[in-house]
């Protein structure tokens, strides 16, 4: 519908403007931008909305650093001031578990309310600098949550793994994680 198209366009514009702001304000700082891949935000938005309409209660996201800040800001609604303070060297989010870590390793969670009024818990897991190390961790987190909820069909808690580069087939951990999907 036209309203859906406008909504997706606004999500795309938010993602693009955020990247341009970070690029202008923090020249030369590592930020692992989403530039060229901004469509990830409307894609994730559509996935969450569609999943919720089919009974999904929780989405657990795992991704390397490329685009994490944008996902944190626009999918998990991590406040801009928290993200920007991490650029200024204040990476403490008040929980005391992030001292010395870098902004593009941080995780976050958020209770999202869909356009239809359904609540979906979103979480982005912490990820170290080892690109796809988080992938099997996400599979384990989701498997445990599904077992706890007795979600035998695997429809209430859904893993989303975002691979942001071309070395997909060259990383053994990716193939091993795909094998886990059949457990």
Spans of features found by a protein language model:
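Conserved internal helical-beta-strand scaffold that buttresses enzyme catalytic cores
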Residues: 1-183
């Amino acid at each position: 519908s036209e309203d859906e198209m406008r909504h997706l366009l606004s999500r795309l514009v938010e993602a693009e403007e955020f990247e341009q702001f970070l690029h202008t304000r923090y020249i030369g700082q590592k930020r692992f931008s989403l530039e060229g891949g901004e469509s990830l935000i409307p894609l994730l938005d559509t996935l969450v909305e569609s999943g919720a309409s089919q009974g999904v209660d929780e989405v657990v996201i795992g991704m390397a650093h490329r685009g994490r800040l944008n996902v944190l800001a626009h999918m998990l609604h991590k406040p801009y001031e928290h993200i920007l303070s991490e650029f200024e060297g204040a990476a403490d989010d008040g929980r005391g578990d992030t001292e010395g870590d870098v902004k593009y390793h941080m995780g976050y969670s958020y209770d999202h309310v869909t356009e239809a009024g359904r609540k979906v818990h979103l979480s982005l897991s912490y990820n170290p600098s080892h690109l796809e190390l988080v992938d099997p961790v996400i599979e384990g987190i989701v498997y445990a949550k599904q077992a706890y909820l007795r979600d035998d069909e695997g429809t209430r808690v859904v893993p989303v793994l975002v691979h942001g580069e071309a070395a997909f087939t060259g990383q053994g951990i990716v193939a091993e994680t795909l094998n886990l999907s059949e457990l």
